[in-house]
């Protein structure tokens, strides 16, 4: 147990979320509990992780979640480990919710995306159809998030573009999407900023250098007979420059997103085109999507991201990287246990709002923990 590597999870504590400040001590080695000397609260070592209040051995949980993240059927896990099916599904739900928190904390941070590709997957559920829309950063192969909705409409596209908006800096950005017209309106409405002005509602100004291109496939008898590439917003020269920067040139395409769709189809049984493993509820599919996507970002080496290391005598070694390493989020490949044990810090403490001047004790807390 290392008190210098943990933080207080109590949101009402002035020291919440701060590491290495000397406010955390070991409360019980036997029970694996820490104590915050500022608020006086104690908390377990596994607080805010997937393993919190689980009675099963951690290694078993890690193995089961790893199998779920790589497409192993739940029935096979039940037979192999002698677990209850409801237990396995609860671990999947808990892991998916935890991975979504990790994704929102680490991935949804402003960065120069360069080129983003988006696409949807038609998912057959038990008795109805849903759509799973996802996006990827081409340069680093980073999965930017996804949204599940019963309808393939403007609300689905806007929710996805809001996810992408949280990950983007105001830089030149190219969107490559399919022929769905809802994408164009969703991109234009998501990437706007309010401009302060006179009294009244501020005017929304679109971002500069937002480029939109569409790839429309033409079908005949369920076969692709042609591809039409359209420039919706921007110039051909601007798009060619971003294509050269992010993918080394080439034509307008959505191949990277389609390859990621194939990865998700191989790891989530409900996404198989013709199969019997149909999902029943949308939250189950949503949690599985975030589990697979976060494991893909942080725990999976991507062959196209490796870098050559040249050695003497004309020798060469390859430096393997995950999408999170390529994006600068982390410096090493995470294990599944490290991902499930990651603790998302709470929001920064805010001093209480009271009438009058703050007391000297409140001023001391603000000076110590808010500066």
Model-predicted regions and their roles:
Residues 1-371:
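Residue-level recognition of single "structural anchor" positions
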């Amino acid at each position: 147990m290392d008190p210098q590597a943990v933080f207080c999870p109590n949101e009402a504590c002035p020291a919440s979320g701060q590491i290495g400040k000397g406010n955390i001590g070991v409360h019980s080695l036997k029970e694996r509990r820490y104590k915050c000397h500022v608020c006086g609260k104690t908390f377990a070592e596994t607080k805010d992780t997937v393993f919190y209040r689980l009675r099963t051995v951690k290694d078993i949980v890690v193995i089961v979640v790893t199998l779920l993240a790589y497409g192993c059927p739940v029935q096979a896990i039940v037979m192999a480990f002698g677990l209850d099916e409801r237990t396995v599904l609860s671990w999947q739900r808990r892991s998916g919710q935890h991975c979504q928190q990790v994704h929102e904390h680490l991935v949804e941070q402003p960065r120069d995306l360069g080129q983003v590709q988006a696409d949807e997957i038609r998912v057959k559920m038990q008795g109805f159809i849903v759509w799973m829309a996802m996006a990827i950063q081409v340069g680093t192969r980073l999965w930017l998030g996804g949204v599940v909705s019963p309808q393939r409409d403007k609300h689905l596209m806007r929710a996805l573009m809001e996810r992408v908006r949280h990950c983007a800096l105001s830089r030149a950005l190219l969107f490559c999407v399919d022929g769905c017209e809802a994408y164009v309106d969703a991109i234009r409405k998501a990437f706007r900023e309010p401009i302060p002005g006179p009294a009244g509602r501020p005017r929304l100004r679109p971002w500069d250098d937002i480029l939109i291109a569409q790839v429309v496939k033409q079908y005949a008898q369920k076969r692709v007979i042609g591809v039409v590439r359209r420039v919706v917003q921007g110039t051909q020269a601007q798009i060619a420059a971003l294509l050269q920067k992010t993918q080394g040139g080439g034509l307008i395409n959505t191949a990277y997103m389609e390859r990621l769709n194939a990865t998700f189809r191989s790891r989530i049984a409900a996404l198989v085109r013709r199969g019997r493993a149909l999902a029943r509820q949308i939250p189950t599919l949503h949690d599985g999507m975030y589990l697979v996507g976060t494991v893909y970002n942080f725990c999976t080496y991507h062959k196209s991201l490796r870098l050559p290391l040249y050695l003497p005598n004309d020798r060469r070694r390859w430096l393997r990287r995950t999408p999170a390493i390529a994006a600068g989020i982390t410096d090493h490949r995470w294990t599944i246990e490290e991902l499930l044990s990651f603790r998302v810090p709470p929001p920064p403490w805010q001093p209480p709002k009271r009438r009058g001047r703050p007391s000297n004790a409140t001023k001391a807390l603000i000076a110590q923990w808010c500066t």
